[in-house]
Amino acid sequence: MISFDLIVEDDSWAALGDLEALCRKAFDAAEYVAPVEEGNIALLLADNHVLHQLNLDFRSKDKPTDVLSFPSLPMDRPFLGDIAVAWGVSASDAKIQGKPLDAHLVHLLIHGYLHLLGFDHETDDEAAEMEALEIKALASLDIANPYRND
């Protein structure tokens, strides 16, 4: 079972209500499609500034991003790693895509979790595998396929 330590550094996230329950729902769905015996995740819900700095420091990209994942080393298990999510980028993307922000956050957390387990989307085949898992996890929560353009 996945446990997580939630750190909220931007008060804007409070608009989503019970963040612990929302994150629990996301990680339960993620674990449904990619189970682990046990694992702990450090989860940071922050602002664009924090994600911008992390993106610059660790990916040499000088801009904010929606979500970043930092897998732990195998010897550090059961700690799976860190996930950080930016309020501004996430809220803007959800609005542009016409999605509820809570559903978008759930998707980002599932996406981040899969990265912690080693899934990636650098190639078309990797992307197809990862997206299929995300779609299945989201469907278990009655959240629409985020990759379908209707």
Swiss-Prot record:
GO terms for biological process: rRNA processing. Keywords: Cytoplasm, Endonuclease, Hydrolase, Metal-binding, Nuclease, Ribosome biogenesis, rRNA processing, Zinc. The keyword Hydrolase applies. GO terms for molecular function: metalloendopeptidase activity; RNA endonuclease activity; zinc ion binding. One of its GO terms (cellular component) is cytoplasm. It is found in: Cytoplasm. Its EC number is 3.1.-.-. It is an enzyme of class 3 (hydrolase). Binds 1 zinc ion. Zn(2+) binds at residues 111, 115, 121. The keyword Nucleus does not apply. It comes from the Bacteria. Its cofactor is Zn(2+). Single strand-specific metallo-endoribonuclease involved in late-stage 70S ribosome quality control and in maturation of the 3' terminus of the 16S rRNA. Belongs to the endoribonuclease YbeY family. This is Endoribonuclease YbeY. It comes from Hyphomonas neptunium (strain ATCC 15444). The lineage of its organism: Bacteria, Pseudomonadati, Pseudomonadota, Alphaproteobacteria, Hyphomonadales.
